[in-house]
Amino acid sequence: MMTQKEKHFERKEKVLGQFFTPPEVAKFIVSFSIRHLDHRETNLACDPACGEGIFLRYLKKEGFEVYGFDIDPIVKEVAPPDVRDDIIIMNGLSDLPHEGEYDIVVGNPPFSAKYGRIHDRDTLSKFELSKGRRSQAIEILFLEKFFKCARKGGVIGVILPYGIFSNTNLKYVRDYILRNSQVLAVIALPRNTFYGTSARTAILFAKKGGPHRGKILMACVSSKLHLTLSEIEKLGKIVEPTDSILYPEFYLQESLELKNSIPLGELVEIRSGQTEYGKNRLFSKSGIPFISAKVVTPLGIDFEKDRKFVSPSSKMYKRRAYAFVGEVVFVRVGVGTIGRVAVITSKEEEGIVDDWSYILTLKTNKVNPYYLAFYLQNPIIKKQILKYARGVGTITIPQRELKKIPVVIPPKEFLEKCEWAYKEMVKLRKEGKINEAGRILKEIEREIEDMIKN
C-alpha cells in the first residue's frame, strides 16, 4: 500500500485534479496581490509549491519574471508549455533562488491533513515556527517560506487551512503573521472549492513588514464566481482585528445583544463526554447505552440511529461522561452535527456520552433543560454557535466560547410549555409520528424567534 507521500507523486492523482487550484481562485489571488503592490521593485514573482503552474501563468501574463518550485518531477509534464521552463524541481522548503527578493509570492501549498507533518530535523531547524518542536504541519512551514521569499513590502497571497485563522492552539502562527506583516485581507472560500475535499480554506493576503497596524478586509464567498475585486469589495467588511482573531465569520456575523439575557456559562456547568479509541474501543451486546453524536437529534435522543452499549467493567465506561435525566447533550463538533441538542428525558435515555459532545447541567431555575434544548438549536442561535466554531475539516466549539452564547430568560409559563412540548415531541417521535413531532418543534422555534427578535 502506498503512503500518502507516494500517492502525491503518482501522476494519476495529479491528472485527476486532486491538487488543482481552480483558475478563478488563482486569477483572483494574482489580481488582488498586484493591486496591493506599491511598486515593482524587482519584477520577480514566485510560487514555492507551484504544482502545474496555474499561478505562474497569471503572473507571467502580468509581465513578471516568474519562478516556480515543486518537489515532484511530474509537474514538468503536466504544466502548460508557456511556464514549463519556469519551474525548478526542488523542495520548496529548502533555500530558494532570490529568496527575500520577490515582489509577489502566491500559491496553494500542500496541507498536513493530506500529507502528514514534517519531522526532518534539518528542515525544522530552518524555520522560526518549528523551533522547539519535533514536527510541524507542512502548511505552516510553507507559510513561513512565503514570508521568507517576499521582499519587504512584497505581497503574499496564500491559500491555507481555515484552522490557521481560527484554532486557539494555532494562535502562535497568527501572532507570527501579525508580527511580520500588514495583513491586507482574509477571504474564506466555499467548502467545495477544491476537488475531493470539503475542508475549509481561506486566502491570506499580507504585505511583508510588521508589526501589523490598521484594518483588515474580511470576506466570505459562497461561490468561486464571487472571486473578483469588485465582488469582494461588496461582500467584505473592513475591520479592526481583535487580539489574534483572523477568521472572517467572527467579524461578519453580528453578535447578538439580547435584552433579559444571561451568558450560557452562568446557567450551566459544562463537562466533556469521553470515549476510547483503538484497541480499547469495544462495545458490548448489552449494558449502558452509548450516546454518540448520531443519536442526538432535534427530536430528542434516538438510539435507533446508532444503538451501542458499554460494559460497566470496560475502559469505555467513563464515570464523568455519564449523562443523567434532566441533563442536556450538546454536540460540539462536526460539519452538519455541531449544535445538535437533546435532553435526557428518562432513565432509558441515560448513558455514556462520547467525546463529540458536551454535557450541560443546569445550576439555576431561571431556565429548564427543555427550553434550553429548543433555544440552542434555534436557527438564530445556531448561527452564533457557528460564529464561535473553530477548525478545518472537523469544526468544533470550545467550552469557553459556548459559554458566551446569550440565553434569553423567558417567563415561567413558557418554561412549563417547553417542558410539556419537549416531552410530547419525544413521545410522538417514539410512536413514529415524525411529522407531528416536527410541528411541535417548529411551533416552539417560532415562539423563541419572536422572543429573540422582540
Label every PLM stretch briefly.
Residues 13-107, 112, 160-163, 179:
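Conserved S-adenosyl-L-methionine
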Residues 110-138:
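Mobile active-site "lid"/loop adjacent to the S-adenosyl-L-methionine
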Residues 134-192, 203:
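Conserved Class I SAM-dependent methyltransferase catalytic core
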Residues 198, 204, 350-358, 389-416:
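A short glycine-rich beta-alpha junction/loop motif
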Residues 200-212:
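Conserved beta strand-loop-helix elements of the APE1-like EEP
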Residues 229-279, 409-454:
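Non-catalytic DNA-recognition/assembly elements of restriction-modification systems
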Residues 265-279, 294-325:
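Sequence-specific dsDNA recognition surfaces
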Residues 319-321, 325-377:
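A short beta-sheet element
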